UniProtKB/Swiss-Prot annotation:
Taxonomy, superkingdom: Bacteria
Function according to Swiss-Prot or TrEMBL: Catalyzes the transfer of a dimethylallyl group onto the adenine at position 37 in tRNAs that read codons beginning with uridine, leading to the formation of N6-(dimethylallyl)adenosine (i(6)A).
The protein's name in its UniProt record: tRNA dimethylallyltransferase
Region of interest: Interaction with substrate tRNA: 57-60
Cofactor(s) annotated in UniProt: Mg(2+)
Site positions per UniProt: Interaction with substrate tRNA: T123, R145
SS bonds (residue pairs): none
Amino acid sequence: MFGLQMSVATSDMNGSDPGQPGQRPAAVLIAGPTASGKSALALRLAQARDGVVINTDSMQMYRDLRIITARPTAEEEALAAHRLYGSVDAAVNFSAGAYVEAAAGALAEARAAGRLPIFVGGTGLYFKALTRGLSAVPPVAAEVRDAVRLRLDRDGVLALHAELARHDPAGAARLAPADRSRIARALEVVLATGRPLADWHNQASPPLLPPEGFVAMFLAPEREALYGRIDARFAAMLQAGALEEVAALAARNLDPLLPAMKAHGVPALIRHFRGELSLEEAAAIGAADTRHYAKRQFTWFRHQLPEFRWVTPEQAESGLLGT
């Protein structure tokens, strides 16, 4: 397979030179949709290879939400070193830049100890920042973004594409005229900053991980089996205390636009507490939202990080652990 019998054929995973036999990778990156078994695999690998499991999931950063985000349990964390789990308060709007800074510290700690860094999670933007660097695009003012979206709905995507061609001809030429989201994004950036989006991307910060030597995979279970696991897991979360966890979060009266307040299942359960939904309805919505998110994860990684090798959980287990 693409094994990590502690000699890593990295060329099998990301196209880089495998190096000498017996070479250990600089890091292992395990991405995949929610409920695909990533965390369990990372834990077994950490136990077998003296590794450190480093969180790469934006929602598992929040300490208020262990159960509803399927964060590793305290018992699992005791079995191997885990970093960046539950390290951020729910009141914080934690950015990708803040994640990269925290991940750099965890990576340096693992390297200093001679341990294998194992990045695991489902947040594509975090993996992209680790392997390609963080975009230098400054925040776009809400009024600019809202105006562009309003015109997109009112005038249509072709009108926006024509306007983009006037401001950023090269950028417009790279985009399909019907690509609504990318055209709107490119137009809002050039209107807000006066510079094409490509200029900003060219100023991206250097990646935290070198382009050679790491193993990168995307766990891709069979879809229907995955969706069944998502439904079963959401029901198990409710039995394990997710209701009480979300109730405690709701009692803090935080801004509903904060990332932690939008974790899958949280909005629906808060509506249940307000009497707007029955528990059964809230559970169905939470599970459905999670299934839809898993679908988006498949699509995002396929288009945004094609260098990640897609494997079944069984192939990943065999390749990493030789089982």
